[in-house]
UniProtKB/Swiss-Prot annotation:
Main location: membrane
Protein name: Autophagy-related protein 2
Keyword set, alphabetical order: Autophagy, Endoplasmic reticulum, Lipid transport, Membrane, Protein transport, Transport
A cellular component term, taken from the record's GO annotations: phagophore
């Protein structure tokens, strides 16, 4: 065109031409500047692009505006394009997941180029255009001559293309709350031959949170309709007339203004690039728009990740959609595999799009002042099919401090080689590196990780698509030596990694060796070593790992990430370990809070799913399956802590096998150990501290769970813990003043994280300080809860087992037993105590409070095991003794009288006469007399006790309350320990050997309680006597039965036991802090014991009495009856606060008690508690006898029944007057032990002697008549005398009160009749019972059945077996241990068999409750005796018939005649006795309760 055309017509022609280009269809003629000629110039201002014609993949263009655009065209073919102020507003497309979205970009670009070419050639291409845009399924016709001409023109134009754009801006609306703004300062591109060179300057990306929400814009349907109908109108007339898109332009302008205004809100810098240099080849024709041989050079790239964390949630959904779209694209690219294979077979190489990239500096800003910088990053893919990437250097900088050090080398820091033909990638770390981490860096990294944890979780949770395993890329990683330094202030931890490698998909990551060192004061120590660490990860599928859950059942752990460690060995000194722990706690103390703030989830789904595995059979195995984020397996872990407590403790070796650590996606962490043991190694001695008990080694026995809320749960099964109480002395000396102060400071807080511990079949073994015994506490099931303010323990059953010598533990293969108690019993332990339902609650604070509640304690014990148990419990507390010089003040203090006086105090040498004032004499003018005040100098007398109480200092620090509902102590005869039985056997054999050799045989005494008399003749068998004493049965000669009896002999039962212990400060006070008074003392602790009810049950087979001790039944109210039967309060004080000497103060209160004392039971109890084994004697370095400062006991009323069995005549001849008591039987003797207060007593043995010396004379002087009245022969007469006395005393008292003589005489008579009548009946019962016994003994002597004829059916004390009664005169003798003297006091007893023992039942037992029952029992007993007579006569008749001669017949008649006469008499006496007993009990109901408590029952 020439310049003679009018300007208006040139604009109209240009407008018509440009509108043929789809992007510029909205151009207005008023915004055009046209100059057409050899150097044509086209100028555009304020262009609104037709964004409906722009189709980008997954992106919708909302608006496009160009402020200024210039186009210069030369006839020679040069094309220059310059623009300024380009703004595009975009958003994610609505059809984001459409499969053909990626093809829309190529179609839009091709259409725009075609429109531009058509406008330049000024030809009609409508027909050709229609052919271009036919469906892709139609065949494409070969190019025409016109097509070739167009392609040639385009090549010339593109070869001389120059572009210069300024102020380019892209605004991407990610969501209504978030926008991304990308700004480019300048874009320059020039063309030289086939090369294109472009420079992009000043690229920045900013995220913005608009102050107002940005609406979503899309192309309306009306716009599309207008666009579709535009071709039907006349193009030229349309261009000349007013543009119909003016309204749309106005709308877009308003929308753009709204978007720009929204950028005034809060902005976040994301990316900065100072300059990008791009060089490429391509875009030469309309049919070849490909770009190849692309080379990019970037000077500096800054990525600000610290600003992205706050808006990360908004863009994650967009990234997820992009990921899903890319995955679909990858699936579609699988269709080109056959084509790629064809190219490979034909050796046809494709032109590479990207051949070289150089990035001088890449800086990731993680957080404030923390960044990672990579320098000289280069990518080279010029040589096909290889691609190499290298990083020259890497830096990690925080606050201008660099944390990564590299070795010097000419090679790049990191290099990556990729082979596209084999999909193999090789990454090499070419330098030795050293990474240092301190608290500041670790804190910033954890905060950064917390910010991006959601991104990691979404990557893990992203659904994986199926891919061909053969198509997985191969990745090889190798490195040089890596050193990781953890700076903890005064300590540096070094981790040295050997060259590690990775081989994906086989091994994700592997470290052959990792060595750990500690550096203190420039001294380097080797701590531990890890070998064969492997890390595996899967994109699809999961690793299935066998584990265990909290119920110790098999569980499967499914995870995509797994780490395996073959061996972990740590060897460290205790001092170094303490230093490391101190540094870690100080430096990393706040890190757990940072970690807890990450990974918050809201899902409440069950973490475990049930999986079913089908076996070959029809059985199904159900295992729990846990989904985890990662899993770590440690096959073997060994930790050795040396020189504990300064070599005094030795070394501690901790071993764990088959350890499993995993965390689920809800941040619950689980740790399990299959074998976890700890062993102490001291010189050549090895002691197991933590060990397996009766546990299968294939099942985990230690599981720890840490929930996302921070609660720790521990589960233990089959775990035993051994503690030697002497170890506390080793560690107590290691406590420094700072550690003690720290403990006091944190005394109110136990733990910061709640801990729950559950125990299943576990045990705690304790060894005392000085003894060789061992105490084991079996815990079948228990739960321990530890919170910030308290510790609670609850269990249903506890079993206490004891062994007398731990050196005698059987080292045999125990295998798997039925219970933990059996496991210990096989080792030689003996079960002694069982505790039912125990609960403990401990609360720290100013006053530490402990509450212990026990439902029932049941103990079955022998004398030797009881002695061992008591001594063991005493010895469990560490021994604390002091020499005399620190307990007492052995030397008086020297007091200087004149210390506070000056030397010149009493001299007048320095007094001047001028200093003396002379006062004149004064006299009283009045004649008043002097008045003297008496008692002016007399001090006020105060109670010493009050002064002492006021001067006592008791600062309570802890309070322990123990409550026991019921306790049973069953005392067995026999001996538990093999050593005891062996000593008795040796003593007996020595006596027998000496007797056979004719040597003198003095009596032997074993264990201070077992007396073995020497044999008096050859017929006496010591072993048989011992067996008779213990088991009440004779055995074969030469065999002794010393094991415990099957039934207990004494039962001590207590109910409602309460113990309250208050402890104070036991530290010495210095003399400077003491008050002036000498009466000041410190109270160390105060203990009170209350027992509501205490009973001792007599179960000896030779005793007829039931309860040895019980509460006296008083005719009082129930409230008084419920008061404690026994109360004890004792206080330990320190009389001199600056000395270690202590004293005791006792106060005892006992309610009235009843004693039914059988001499055999008394002797058994005495010998039981006197047993002393020299092995269990506690010897202190400084023996201390307890000094009792004050002892007080109230007046005790005793109702005593006493039945002697034998008399010690030897002791009687030696002056023991107590033996006179064994001549008499006492029945309800009333004894009152008077109130006693004692001061200054040395030891408890001395206390016993003093009390005996006080009470015995008082009883003999003031209470002898009452005791004599309780003697059995005089008891009836004493009752009759009391009745006669009541006949006078009662009327007199009643007459004095009421004044009525008749009523008084009536009451007196009633008392007389009731008393005398009852005593007459009792006397008759005694006479009839005595007569029955005499008749039965006579019958027995004459060959009859004797007491066997009663035929009483009884129940055993601890069984349901029914046996028949029998009598054996030979065992009516004394049953003392080695004395066969006849016993005449058993004439009213009958012996009944009871398993391995024989039970004796008195004739006074099982009395009828009323007169009717007495008649019924009398009738039954009389009939039974007549039947016995009839049977004996019938038997005699049969014997006479079968007799061989008259002499034998007469002998049979002589034997049967007395029996026939005596047995009916026995029946009469027994019937009369039962009748009288029923009559007596009819009028005295209290006698029934007394009989039931006193006598054993046959029922």
């Amino acid at each position: 065109m020439t310049s003679w055309l009018p300007q208006n017509l040139q604009k109209r022609l240009l407008l018509y031409t440009i509108k043929q280009v789809s992007l510029f269809s909205n151009v207005d003629v008023s915004n055009l500047d046209v100059s057409i000629g050899s150097q044509s110039h086209f100028g555009f201002t304020d262009i609104d692009l037709n964004v409906c014609e722009i189709n980008l993949p997954n992106i919708e263009v909302l608006s496009g505006r160009i402020s200024k655009l210039n186009l210069q065209l030369a006839v020679a073919g040069n094309v220059e394009i310059s623009g300024e102020g380009m703004v595009f507003v975009l958003k994610p497309a609505d059809g984001f997941f459409d499969d053909d979205s990626s093809e829309q970009w190529a179609s839009s670009l091709t259409k725009s180029v075609m429109d531009m070419t058509k406008s330049i050639l000024d030809t009609e291409l409508s027909e050709y255009q229609s052919k271009i845009y036919k469906d892709t399924n139609e065949d494409i016709k070969p190019p025409t001559a016109l097509d070739s001409m167009m392609d040639k023109v385009l090549r010339v134009a593109l070869s001389k293309l120059t572009i210069n754009l300024k102020n380019v801006e892209l605004q991407l609306i990610i969501s209504p709350e978030l926008m991304l703004k990308i700004s480019i300062s300048e874009v320059k591109m020039i063309s030289a031959d086939e090369k294109r060179i472009a420079d992009v300057i000043g690229v920045s990306a900013v995220f913005s949170k608009p102050e107002q929400s940005v609406p979503s814009y899309g192309s309306s349907s009306s716009d599309k309709e207008d666009d579709n109908t535009s071709d039907s109108e006349d193009p030229l007339s349309t261009s000349i007339t007013y543009s119909k898109l003016e309204a749309t332009s106005i709308y877009l302008s308003a929308m753009e203004s709204l978007v720009l205004d929204s950028l005034d809100g809060e902005t976040y810098q994301f990316l900065n690039i100072d300059k990008i240099e791009v060089q490429f080849q391509g875009i030469t024709s309309i049919n070849d728009l490909k770009v190849h041989d692309l080379k990019i050079k970037i000077n500096a790239l800054d990525i600000h990740l610290e600003n992205v964390s706050s808006i990360l949630s908004h863009i994650m959904s967009l990234l997820n959609h992009v990921q899903l779209s890319n995955s679909e694209d990858k699936i579609r690219t699988q269709e080109l595999k056959s084509y790629k294979r064809f190219q490979h077979e034909q050796n046809i190489e494709e032109d590479k799009t990207l051949t070289f990239v150089l990035l001088n500096s890449l800086k990731f800003h993680l957080r404030d002042n923390l960044f990672i910088m990579l320098t000289e990053i280069s990518l080279n893919s010029s040589v096909s099919p290889y691609t190499s990437v290298s990083i020259s250097d890497i830096q990690l900088v925080l606050d201008s401090k660099e944390y990564i050090n590299r070795s010097d080398s000419s090679e790049p820091f990191l290099s990556l080689n990729k082979n596209s033909s084999t999909s193999e990638q090789k990454l090499h770390l070419n330098r030795d590196i050293k990474v240092e981490v301190d608290y500041s860096l670790m804190k910033q990294l954890i905060l950064f990780a917390n910010d991006y944890m959601c991104l990691y979780n979404q990557i893990i949770e992203r659904p994986s698509t199926y891919a061909d395993p053969s198509a997985d890329p191969k990745f090889l990683l190798s490195s040089q030596n890596v050193c990781f330094l953890l700076n903890l202030g005064d300590l540096i931890m070094e981790f040295h990694f050997s060259p590690f490698f990775s081989n994906i998909p086989h091994t994700t990551f592997k470290i052959p060796k990792l060595s750990i060192f500690s550096v203190q004061n420039n001294e380097k120590s080797h701590i531990g070593e890890l070998t064969d660490f492997e890390f595996h990860s899967r994109k699809s599928g999961c690793f299935n790992i066998s584990g265990a859950n909290s119920k110790f059942c098999a569980s499967n752990v499914n995870t995509k990430t797994k780490a395996t460690l073959e061996n972990l060995e740590v060897s460290i000194l205790e001092s170094d370990m303490n230093k490391i722990i101190q540094c870690l706690s100080g430096v990393l103390g706040s890190l757990p809070e940072l970690l807890l703030s990450s990974g918050e989830t809201t899902s409440s789904k069950n973490m475990e799913k049930r999986s079913v595995r089908m076996m070959q059979s029809s059985a199904f195995l159900h295992n729990r399956t846990a989904l985890s984020m990662f899993c770590v397996q440690i096959n073997c872990m060994k930790i050795k802590i040396s020189n504990i407590s300064g070599k005094a403790f030795g070394d501690l070796m901790i071993t764990a096998r088959k350890s499993l650590i995993y965390q689920d996606k809800y941040s619950d962490l689980s740790i399990s150990f299959t074998e976890f043991t700890a062993q102490r190694q001291y010189r050549s001695e090895k002691t197991d501290i933590i060990f397996d008990i009766n546990h299968d080694s294939n099942i985990a026995n230690f599981v720890i769970n840490r929930t996302k809320v921070g609660k720790i749960k521990a589960y233990l099964t089959g775990v035993g813990i051994f503690i030697h109480t002497k170890w506390s002395e080793l560690f107590s000396g290691q406590k420094t003043e700072n550690s003690i102060n720290e403990q006091k400071k944190n005394a109110k807080t136990l733990v910061s994280i709640p801990i729950d511990i559950k125990l299943y079949d576990c045990a705690l073994s304790l060894k005392p300080c000085r003894l060789s015994t061992g105490l084991a506490i079996n815990i079948p099931r228990a739960q321990i809860n530890i919170t910030k303010n308290e510790i609670t323990l609850s269990t249903k059953i506890l079993d206490l087992l004891l062994i007398d010598d731990m050196n005698l533990i059987h080292e045999t293969d125990l295998g798997h037993t039925t219970s933990t108690s059996n496991w210990y019993e096989k080792q030689g332990y003996s079960s002694l105590v069982k505790i039912d339902t125990l609960s403990v609650r401990f609360c720290p604070g100013g006053v530490a409070s402990t509450r212990v509640n026990v439902h029932k304690i049941d103990s079955s014990i022998c004398s030797d095991s009881f002695n061992a148990l008591i001594q063991t419990i005493i010895d469990l507390k560490p021994v604390v003794t002091y020499p005399e010089n620190v307990k007492y003040q052995l030397e008086p203090e020297l007091v200087s009288v004149f210390e506070d006086l000056t030397d010149q105090y009493f001299t007048t040498a320095r007094i001047s006469e001028n200093d003396l004032e002379i006062y004149p004499d004064t006299y009283s003018n009045s004649g008043e007399s002097l008045v003297f005040e008496e008692n002016y100098f007399s001090p006020k007398l105060e109670s010493p006790s009050k002064n002492e109480v006021n001067m006592a200092v008791f600062e309570i620090l802890s309070n322990v309350k123990i409550s026991v509902d019921e306790i049973k102590l069953k005392l067995y005869d026999g001996y538990d320990w093999k050593h005891t039985r062996k000593e008795i056997n040796s003593a007996v054999e020595q006596l027998e050997e000496n007797f056979k050799d004719g040597l003198s045989c003095p009596d032997a005494k074993v264990f201070d309680s077992i007396y073995i008399p020497a044999p008096r003749d050859e017929d006496e068998n010591i072993k048989s006597n011992i067996n008779m004493k213990i088991h009440n049965e004779e055995t074969k000669e030469g065999k002794m039965k010393l094991r415990p009896t099957k039934k207990y002999k004494i039962l001590i039962q207590g109910n409602g036991i309460k113990v309250n212990i208050q402890s104070g400060n036991d530290e010495l006070r210095t003399t400077s802090t003491l008050p002036l008074s000498d009466n000041t003392y410190d109270i160390l602790n105060e203990t009170s014991v209350q027992i509501n009810n205490l009973e001792i049950v007599d179960n000896l087979p030779t005793s007829t009495w039931n309860k040895f001790l019980t509460r006296t039944k008083l005719k009082t109210t129930n409230t008084l009856q419920q008061s404690p039967m026994f109360s004890l309060r004792f206080t330990m004080i320190r009389p001199t606060p600056h000395l270690y000497a202590t004293e005791l103060i006792f106060s005892v209160h006992v309610k009235p008690i009843s004693l039914h004392v059988d001499q055999d039971a008394l002797e058994f109890l005495t010998l039981f508690f006197q047993f002393k084994d020299p092995r269990f004697e506690l010897i202190d370095d400084y023996p201390d006898i307890p000094y009792i400062q004050r002892f007080e006991i109230n007046s005790v009323k005793i109702l005593l029944d006493y039945k002697p069995k034998k008399v010690d005549y030897v002791g009687l001849r030696s002056g023991k007057t107590k033996e006179f008591m064994n001549f008499f039987i006492l029945d309800q003797a009333k004894i009152n032990l008077k109130h006693v207060i004692l001061y200054g007593i040395d030891g408890f043995s001395r206390l016993e002697t003093i009390l005996t010396d006080i009470w015995t004379p008082d009883i003999t002087k003031t209470q002898l008549p009452g005791i004599l009245g309780a003697l059995t022969p005089f008891k009836p007469f004493a009752g009759l005398s009391y009745g006669a006395r009541a006949l006078v005393s009662v009327p007199t008292e009643q007459y004095q009160q009421s004044g009525r003589l008749g009523t008084s005489l009536q009451k007196g008579g009633m008392v007389f009749l009731r008393t005398t009548g009852g005593e007459f009946v009792k006397l008759a019962v005694r006479l009839t019972s005595g007569t029955q016994t005499i008749l039965e003994s006579t019958e027995k002597l004459l060959g009859g059945q004797g007491s066997n004829g009663r035929n009483i059916k009884i129940k055993l004390v601890e069984g349901d077996e029914i046996v028949d009664a029998f009598i054996d005169e030979s065992i009516l003798r004394s049953t003392t241990l080695f004395d066969n003297t006849a016993n005449d006091n058993n004439h009213l007893d009958v012996i009944l068999p009871q398993g391995d023992t024989q039970k004796v039942i008195s004739l006074y037992a099982d009395q009828p409750k009323d007169f009717y029952s007495g008649l019924h029992d009398a009738y039954s007993s009389f009939g039974r005796n007549l039947n016995i007579t009839f049977d004996s006569m019938k038997q005699a008749k049969n014997d006479i018939k079968t007799a061989n001669g008259a002499q034998e017949a007469v002998s049979t008649v002589a034997k049967a005649a007395p029996l026939a006469l005596i047995r009916p008499l026995i029946g009469v006496t027994e019937a009369l006795s039962k009748t009288l007993q029923g009559l007596n009990n009819q009028y005295d109901q209290e006698e029934i309760a007394h009989i039931e408590e006193k006598y054993k029952s046959s029922n």
